[in-house]
């Protein structure tokens, strides 16, 4: 058995069953016969012992090798490849080739029929040669008499074997030549066609379809049967065998099938996912071809299934085990019995994923799982059920939203969840909050919960509204669930248990939730003092969840605005917090859903939601306030109502972006508090009670403060108390600190002032808005104002009529603040201006208190305290954003990250110092001290942060860094006052409330930039897309997740504290300080996380720079924060990097140092690399997508920010600098790994992993786990080795093997550090990983790396494919007489309303000629010239040349051929759809262009045909006409804005192609764009596209929203655009609005009629979106939901080139 054959024989064994362990390199080398193997096994222990004993491996190895040499001395002949039958026309040459192995070397004899052929005297008729073990019989100028059975017989001393092939010779007629050969083919094709058509629909929907398919092609089924149970799946292979006929291939297929019997289960599981995917419909055509695949090869079905298995194996297992155990068993049985049947059944639902979207499946699985769980409740059925119940319990709306928006939202939330997962970990609880509430309500304090819920839902008097919020929760829970699935492994039981699932899925969250909400419920009555003393998380949660009903509402309401700012991050937190306060949850969910699922809804219905949310919050606030304090309630209520009104109004204009933020802000404030609380709860379950008490106390204090503030508006003590309270609220996390906070109020205020100075906007405002009730309103108003200021452009409407004065004042304050920290006076004035000046006196008093910190700062600070006075009320809402927020941030951060936070605070303080000046500088430590002391005596930590805190610091540090960056960004934002950027900046960093509001709303886990992008999108109905575009690479997401987890903890604590301090939320600068940890432990974390996470890969130094740039970018995004704040920002950033470096180091110290073994294994490095890659895995898409969205919306902003460009660079860097990043990232990576370790399943698609990681990180166990991870990390047992496929196609197979895969993992292949594909691996799936290199050529030389990573770690192995290595393989056989093919045209019978169907097949023969250039896509496609012999008329005449293109790199799995065929099929089908659909669009464009006088010639996109080559291991390819000349690129996604040819310098064809792009973009409302065109003259090919939504018209792998945005911002109209009357594109912001406007669909009036087709197309799109069908109902909604889908699936789609997608799909 040759080494080559081993793999084909069985991947599992790699050719060697027992020898695998000792010599990694020996596997392929020796493949002994059974006898020798047995002998070897008995001998081996001695060898291995000796090698172990002698610390001299070489001696042991040599002994082992010598033994093997002896054992394998004599083996009987064996055909690695057998003869293939040929059918040729007369005068053609034929070559029969076989590869024979054996020892001694066999002697091969050739026979014609039964006559032996002379080895030496055959010429001129034939020639017998052999090269190595390859034996060839060449026949020249065949005649009919040469038709015969040719046989090769190999013999040696051990035996004799033979194989034969049939030669048919006929005249030049298709019929004669193929009478026999093609009769079979045609029958098969007919059956296949039927199968495809039926399987597309049936396979997905009907598992029983398998039977139908079988009935359709009984032959195949019977063949399978004959093959035997193990080979049952092999029938396709057998089918192929007759055609291509390689025994090895057949066996391999069998093996794969057999191996995949388990896959069936997984597939079955996946099927649910697939169904959930919603990709099924679009993939029907593609998947439908699964039937084709089935027909071609059950192997192919197996392949897709395997892909599913890999991708969702773990998940499937989870689901199967958890929910589908029953199904799984049957499936296993089925798999064993008729794996194919099982697979067919499973593929029917699973196939879409397996076939075309493994990558998507990963994400979708995550996504789908939630959905599936909801529907199925497999692994996460419990959680899902719980969530559903929660949704149902929460409110019908919630349930409704979950069902309808859920899928889309899930996708959207996927992103958020990815980022928020950490937060979300809690949030799922929050989401489940209703559930949790329900669950807890019974066991824990239903009263508290009910009140909370009643308050949030009932009190608001808008259950529906709360439901909205809650509805989003279900979505989030789904997302969470999606991410939870990774956890489900560990938490499968939990999933099963609604509550358990909730608690476990977001372990911390559940725990905190479970504890905190109950505590909250129970503790709602808890005195403020108690509240103060609760754990931060607990406090946050308790505060949010367990304030008095009024307080809760108040907090929620108040928090809502603040949360709005930090809504994203908070959303996650809120999810957790939900149990604490459903109202909070609802807002958060609402925001999340609105942001995500309802991104379109948000825009369209977001206002409603926002209004509802606002209402709820207004009502809730009013009621809550009333409940809490009549006095405060009235003042607050007014404020809140005004704020609420503002919010509700503002949501409409700004709500899409801000509504979620505000609503989310409220909900999120609580959520964040809850999140922080929950996370902290994880950390401090015990403290949770305290926290709850503290929360209560805080709330009570807040309430008291509010009351006191209201009662004693001007009382300094009250102010102080308020301040202190705020601090408490701010440092809800560190309630203990809260008491100290009062003393530190001054310092904190200064700190806040610092923040304010940097982000004066929000800071001053909130104070101004009012004392306590006022401050609450002020907070809301301030938040809004800040948002207005920060989000001014974005949320012009943010200013609510009720609070307009306040807003005005706030804005003024913000402006003043932006101008300088000296806004103290203005702040006071503004405070006075604030409509809610009832506490105005107190405000002034508060201001004086704040003055302690510094004049301006003091003023702001005062405001902060004042706001804090209102912590329960407005403060909570805005505290984060408010000055309090800042202190809270620092304190809250400190509390949140207590140790780390303090450290961060320290750094933050200095950073603030930079921005604010000495007062702040001195105060931050004080503040920190207060915070620290209160929290954990962290003050010392702040200055001399204790190592312990630092241990926690990794996340905190990251958060702080992120926050600092945000702060800088905010200050810049405030300074720039750029609305959009400011919004994000302020929202994200500057004003925690505003910033948090805006960005948070956008994407909890996304960076501010991303958030802003999302916000913009939300406004433009592109939130989902934006989120997707913003999708961080898995790496980034993971980082975000980790950061978010830590920050969520810190953030929740901070939120709790910030919540108290949120009243002053307006202080943008404060936000930075607060942002440091408070802004969003979720958001700042997210934003920072993104930057920081990305930075982390770069390393501490890089982190600093990267972060800086990222932050700067965000800040720039935030609106040209370059102005005043930028100086401090820069400094802060500079400091932050240093700190970051410090902290990362510290964090690293917390993490165990990488051991030499670990380094050797590359586990850590690789971990980071995978992350990097993951980031890159977004592949072009993720980096490009993220970057692109960043670029298009942020491109200008980036320019504003010094580091901005760096951010994309960083992202881009991920693949190229993968190693560097990983090295630098090591610390972070470790953290991430820890998070990942905690995260049950990174495989979930990276997003889940990230979320899971976050959740895991939330656990304090993260570090210990990290330590454990080294042992649990995957290990390499077989390095990459290269083999040749046995079909003489010239294709190579790279494969390697990993073991110790203890959890769901993601396996990534990269070439020269550029990701080319990725597949999921379920826990325990240790089969080989393979990458097929089609028709290997020198173009394919390079360094290939295979990396596997999961939460325990990562491992990778490299291989350099050099020309020398290539030369050792025999290139593709030349002199062939061609190959039989089936060619299928794609027909759009219904125009673009149709996603395309397949026309009648043509059967013919091609002769492949020389290989053309690497083709498009950086070598991802191979193009070769072919000559048509016959059979393709009328499309191609005989003798015509055409071009065959095939994907060059295909990632497949253990059941090699099967999976390989599936990937090959999916990629090829996508290519056909892309080009042919673009051709249809081009036809419409041509019709309109011709109608325009003087337009001239119009480009034409040539059709692409699908061909199937039965004899090829990689059978699917595309065929197109040969344009005769080298292609010229007319437009390319590779061109940057700068690289794009200028209109004047480009050719007419190029200009018209760009006009076509513009027309198409406008015609499809910005949802479809042709990105690449190359051609000759006016004929175009090599089409690449970008869609805004994943699954758009079935195009699953082409979702690149970033490219759409980039095009919108970079396209320069030319004369032809004007000729067609196209509206100039003003960037994505303008474009998206266009997209929103249905009327603007047709760029030209004439187009309206034709526009119907695109619309129907869109309608059709939903089918691809399957699950998202509800979204399609309204265009806006579908867009939003689809983008959400895109987001979730965005990364996989980037694999379009067959890279990542190949594996994922």
From Swiss-Prot:
EC number(s) reported in the record: 2.7.11.1
Which residues are modified to Phosphoserine?
A: 228, 1222
Task: Please give the Gene Ontology molecular function terms for this protein.
Answer: ATP binding; protein serine kinase activity; protein serine/threonine kinase activity
InterPro entries named in the record: a-kinase_dom, Ig-like_dom, Ig-like_dom_sf, Ig-like_fold, Ig_I-set, Ig_sub, Ig_sub2, Kinase-like_dom_sf
* A GO biological process held by the record: cardiac muscle cell development
Query: Polar residues: which segments have biased composition?
Result: 495-504, 598-609, 666-676, 708-729, 1664-1696
Q: Which UniProt keywords apply?
A: Cardiomyopathy, Developmental protein, Disease variant, Disulfide bond, Immunoglobulin domain, Kinase, Nucleus, Phosphoprotein, Repeat, Serine/threonine-protein kinase, Transferase
Which intervals hold domain Ig-like?
77-168, 1274-1362
Which chemical reaction does it catalyze?
L-seryl-[protein] + ATP = O-phospho-L-seryl-[protein] + ADP + H(+); L-threonyl-[protein] + ATP = O-phospho-L-threonyl-[protein] + ADP + H(+)
Q: SUPFAM superfamilies, alphabetically?
A: Immunoglobulin, Protein kinase-like (PK-like)
What PANTHER family does this protein's entry cite?
ALPHA-PROTEIN KINASE 2-RELATED (PTHR47091), ALPHA-PROTEIN KINASE 3 (PTHR47091:SF1)
In the record, the note on similarity to other proteins reads:
Belongs to the protein kinase superfamily. Alpha-type protein kinase family. ALPK subfamily.
Tell me what disease the record lists for it.
Answer: Cardiomyopathy, familial hypertrophic, 27: A form of hypertrophic cardiomyopathy, a heart disorder characterized by ventricular hypertrophy, which is usually asymmetric and often involves the interventricular septum. The symptoms include dyspnea, syncope, collapse, palpitations, and chest pain. They can be readily provoked by exercise. The disorder has inter- and intrafamilial variability ranging from benign to malignant forms with high risk of cardiac failure and sudden cardiac death. CMH27 is a severe, early-onset form with features of hypertrophic and dilated cardiomyopathy.
UniProt name for this protein: Alpha-protein kinase 3
This protein's species is: Homo sapiens
Q: What is the lineage of its organism?
A: Eukaryota, Metazoa, Chordata, Craniata, Vertebrata
């Amino acid at each position: 058995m040759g080494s080559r054959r081993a793999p084909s024989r069985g991947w599992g064994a790699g050719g060697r069953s027992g020898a695998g362990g000792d010599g990694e390199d020996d596997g392929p080398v020796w493949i002994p016969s059974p006898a020798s193997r047995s002998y070897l096994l008995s001998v081996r222990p001695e060898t291995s012992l000796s090698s172990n004993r002698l610390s001299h491996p070489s001696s042991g190895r040599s002994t082992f090798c010598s033994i093997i040499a002896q054992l394998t001395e004599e083996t009987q002949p064996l055909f690695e490849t057998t003869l293939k039958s040929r059918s040729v026309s007369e005068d053609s040459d034929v070559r029969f080739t076989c590869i024979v192995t054996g020892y001694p070397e066999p002697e091969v004899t050739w026979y014609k029929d039964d006559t032996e052929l002379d080895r030496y005297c055959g010429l001129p008729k034939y020639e017998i040669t052999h090269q190595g073990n390859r034996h060839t019989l060449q026949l020249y100028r065949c005649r009919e008499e040469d038709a015969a059975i040719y046989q090769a017989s190999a013999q040696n001393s051990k035996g004799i074997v033979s194989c034969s092939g049939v030669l048919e010779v006929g005249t030049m007629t298709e019929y004669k030549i193929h009478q026999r050969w093609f009769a079979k083919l045609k029958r098969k094709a007919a059956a296949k066609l039927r199968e495809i058509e039926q399987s597309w629909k049936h396979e997905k929907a009907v598992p029983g379809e398998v039977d139908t398919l079988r009935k359709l092609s009984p032959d195949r089924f019977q063949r399978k049967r004959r093959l035997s149970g193990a080979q049952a799946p092999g029938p396709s292979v057998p089918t192929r065998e007759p055609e291509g006929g390689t025994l090895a291939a057949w066996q391999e297929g069998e093996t794969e099938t057999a191996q995949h019997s388990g896959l069936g289960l997984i597939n079955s599981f996946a099927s649910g996912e697939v169904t959930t995917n919603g990709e099924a419909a679009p993939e029907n055509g593609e998947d439908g071809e699964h039937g084709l695949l089935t027909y071609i090869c059950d192997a192919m079905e197996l392949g897709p299934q395997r892909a599913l298995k890999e991708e969702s194996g773990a998940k499937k297992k989870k689901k199967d085990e958890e929910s589908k155990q029953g199904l799984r068993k049957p499936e296993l049985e089925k798999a064993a019995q008729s794996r194919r049947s099982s697979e067919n059944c499973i593929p029917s639902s699973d196939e879409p994923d397996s076939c075309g979207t493994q990558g998507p499946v990963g994400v979708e699985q995550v996504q789908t799982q939630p959905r599936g769980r909801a529907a199925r409740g497999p692994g996460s059925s419990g959680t899902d059920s719980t969530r559903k119940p929660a949704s149902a319990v929460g409110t019908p709306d919630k349930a409704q939203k979950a069902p309808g928006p859920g899928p889309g939202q899930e996708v959207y939330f996927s992103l958020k969840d990815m980022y928020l997962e950490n937060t979300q970990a809690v949030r799922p609880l929050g989401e489940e909050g209703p559930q949790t509430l329900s669950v807890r309500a019974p066991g824990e304090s239903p009263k508290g919960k009910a009140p909370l819920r009643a308050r949030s839902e009932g009190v608001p008097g808008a259950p529906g509204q709360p439901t909205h919020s809650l509805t989003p929760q279900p979505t989030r829970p789904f997302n969470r669930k999606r991410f939870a699935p990774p956890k489900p492994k560990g938490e499968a039981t939990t999933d099963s248990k609604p509550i358990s699932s909730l608690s476990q899925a977001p372990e911390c969250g559940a725990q905190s939730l479970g504890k905190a909400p109950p505590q909250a419920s129970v503790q709602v009555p808890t005195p403020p003092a108690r509240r103060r003393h609760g754990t931060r998380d607990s406090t946050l949660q308790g505060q949010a969840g367990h304030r008095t009903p009024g307080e809760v509402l108040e907090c929620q309401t108040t928090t809502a605005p603040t949360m709005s700012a930090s809504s994203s991050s908070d959303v996650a937190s809120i999810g957790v917090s939900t149990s604490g306060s459903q109202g909070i949850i609802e807002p958060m969910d609402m925001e999340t859903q609105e942001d995500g699922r309802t991104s379109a809804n948000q825009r369209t219905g977001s206002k409603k939601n926002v209004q509802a949310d606002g209402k709820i919050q207004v009502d809730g606030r009013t009621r809550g306030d009333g409940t809490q304090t009549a006095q405060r309630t009235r003042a607050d209520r007014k404020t809140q109502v005004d704020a609420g009104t503002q919010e509700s109004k503002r949501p409409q204009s700004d709500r899409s972006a801000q509504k979620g933020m505000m609503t989310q802000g409220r909900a999120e404030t609580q959520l964040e508090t809850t999140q922080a609380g929950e996370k902290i709860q994880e950390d401090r379950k015990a403290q949770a009670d305290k926290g709850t008490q503290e929360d209560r106390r805080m709330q009570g204090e807040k309430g008291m403060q509010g009351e006191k503030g209201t009662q004693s508006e001007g009382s300094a003590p009250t102010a102080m108390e308020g301040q202190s309270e705020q601090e408490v609220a701010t440092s809800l996390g560190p309630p203990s600190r809260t008491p100290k906070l009062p003393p530190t109020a001054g310092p904190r205020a200064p700190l806040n002032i610092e923040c304010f100075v940097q982000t004066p906007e929000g800071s001053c405002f909130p104070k101004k808005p009012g004392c306590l009730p006022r401050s609450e309103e002020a907070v809301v108003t301030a938040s809004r104002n800040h948002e207005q200021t920060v989000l001014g452009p974005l949320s012009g409407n943010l200013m609510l009529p009720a609070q307009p004065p306040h807003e005005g004042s706030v804005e003024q304050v913000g402006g003043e603040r932006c101008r300088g920290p000296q806004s103290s006076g203005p702040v006071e004035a503004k405070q006075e201006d604030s409509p809610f000046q009832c506490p105005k006196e107190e405000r002034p008093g508060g201001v004086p208190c704040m003055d302690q910190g510094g004049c301006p700062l003091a003023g702001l600070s005062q405001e902060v305290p004042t706001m804090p006075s209102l912590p329960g009320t407005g403060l909570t809402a805005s505290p984060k954003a408010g000055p309090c927020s800042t202190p809270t941030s620092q304190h809250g951060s400190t509390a949140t990250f207590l140790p780390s936070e303090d450290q961060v605070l320290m750094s933050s303080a200095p950073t603030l110092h930079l921005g604010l000046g000495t007062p702040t500088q001195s105060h931050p430590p004080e503040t920190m001290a207060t915070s620290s002391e209160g929290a954990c005596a962290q003050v010392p930590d702040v200055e001399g942060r204790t190592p312990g805190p630092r241990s926690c610091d990794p996340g905190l540090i990251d958060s702080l860094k992120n926050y600092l960056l945000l702060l800088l960004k905010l200050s810049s934002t405030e300074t720039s006052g750029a609305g959009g950027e400011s919004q994000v900046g302020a929202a994200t960093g500057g004003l925690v409330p505003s910033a948090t509001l805006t960005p948070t709303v956008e994407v909890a886990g996304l960076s501010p930039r991303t958030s802003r992008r999302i916000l913009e999108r939300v406004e433009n109905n592109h939130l989902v897309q934006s989120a997707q575009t913003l999708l961080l690479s898995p790496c980034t997401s993971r980082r975000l997740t980790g950061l978010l987890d830590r920050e969520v903890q810190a953030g929740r604590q901070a939120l709790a504290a910030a919540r108290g301090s949120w009243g002053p939320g307006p202080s943008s600068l404060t936000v930075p300080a607060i942002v440091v940890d408070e802004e969003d432990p979720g958001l700042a974390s997210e934003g920072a996380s993104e930057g920081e996470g990305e930075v982390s890969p770069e390393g501490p130094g890089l982190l600093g720079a990267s972060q800086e740039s990222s932050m700067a970018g965000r800040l720039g995004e935030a609106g040209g924060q370059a102005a005043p704040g930028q100086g401090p920002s820069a400094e802060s950033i500079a400091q932050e990097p240093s700190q970051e470096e410090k902290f990362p180091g510290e964090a690293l110290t917390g993490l165990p140092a990488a051991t030499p073994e670990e380094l050797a294994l590359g586990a850590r490095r690789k971990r980071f690399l995978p992350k990097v890659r993951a980031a890159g895995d977004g592949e072009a898409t993720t980096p490009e997508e993220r970057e692109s969205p960043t670029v298009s919306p942020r491109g200008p902003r980036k320019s504003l920010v010094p580091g901005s460009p760096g951010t994309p660079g960083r992202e881009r860097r991920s693949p190229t600098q993968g190693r560097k990043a990983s090295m630098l990232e090591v610390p972070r990576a470790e953290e991430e790994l820890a998070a990942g370790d905690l995260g049950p399943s990174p495989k979930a698609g990276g997003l889940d992993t990230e979320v899971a990681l976050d959740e895991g990180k939330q656990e304090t166990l993260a570090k210990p786990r990290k330590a454990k991870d080294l042992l649990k990390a995957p290990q390499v047992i077989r390095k990459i080795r290269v083999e040749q496929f046995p079909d003489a196609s010239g294709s190579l197979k790279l494969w390697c093997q990993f073991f110790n895969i203890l959890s769901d993992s993601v396996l990534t292949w990269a070439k020269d550090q550029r990701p080319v594909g990725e597949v999921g691996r379920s826990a325990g799936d240790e089969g080989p990983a393979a990458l097929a290199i089609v028709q290997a050529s020198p173009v394919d030389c390079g360094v290939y790396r295979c990396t596997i990573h999961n939460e325990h770690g990562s491992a990778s192995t490299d291989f350099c494919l050099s020309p020398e290595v290539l030369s050792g393989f025999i290139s593709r056989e030349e002199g062939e007489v061609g190959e039989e093919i089936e060619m299928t045209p794609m027909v759009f019978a219904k125009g673009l309303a149709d996603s395309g169907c397949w026309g009648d097949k043509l059967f013919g023969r091609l002769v492949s000629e020389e290989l053309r250039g690497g083709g498009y896509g950086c070598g991802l496609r191979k193009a070769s010239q072919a000559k048509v012999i016959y059979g393709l008329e009328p499309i191609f005449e005989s003798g015509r040349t055409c071009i065959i293109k095939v994907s060059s790199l295909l990632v497949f799995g253990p059941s090699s051929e099967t999976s390989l065929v599936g990937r090959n099929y999916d990629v090829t089908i996508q290519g056909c759809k892309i080009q042919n659909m673009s051709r249809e669009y081009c036809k419409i464009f041509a019709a309109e262009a011709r109608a325009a006088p003087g337009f001239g010639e119009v480009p034409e996109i040539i059709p692409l045909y699908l061909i199937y080559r039965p004899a090829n291991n990689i059978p699917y390819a595309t065929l197109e006409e040969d344009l005769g000349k080298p292609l010229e690129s007319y437009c390319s996604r590779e061109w940057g804005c700068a690289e794009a040819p200028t209109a004047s310098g480009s050719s007419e064809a190029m200009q018209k192609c760009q006009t076509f792009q513009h027309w198409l973009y406008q015609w499809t409302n910005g949802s479809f764009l042709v990105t690449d065109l190359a051609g000759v003259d006016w004929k175009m090919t090599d089409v690449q596209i970008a869609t805004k939504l994943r699954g758009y018209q079935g195009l699953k792998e082409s979702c690149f929203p970033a490219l759409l945005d980039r095009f919108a911002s970079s396209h320069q109209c030319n004369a032809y655009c004007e000729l067609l009357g196209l509206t100039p594109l003003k960037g994505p912001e303008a474009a998206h609005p266009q997209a929103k406007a249905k009327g603007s669909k047709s760029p030209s009036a004439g187009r309206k009629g034709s526009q119907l087709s695109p619309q129907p197309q869109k309608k059709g799109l939903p089918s691809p979106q399957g699950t998202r069908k509800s979204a399609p109902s309204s265009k806006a909604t579908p867009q939003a939901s689809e983008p959400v889908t895109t987001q979730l699936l965005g990364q996989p789609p980037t694999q379009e080139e067959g890279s990542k997608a190949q594996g994922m799909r």
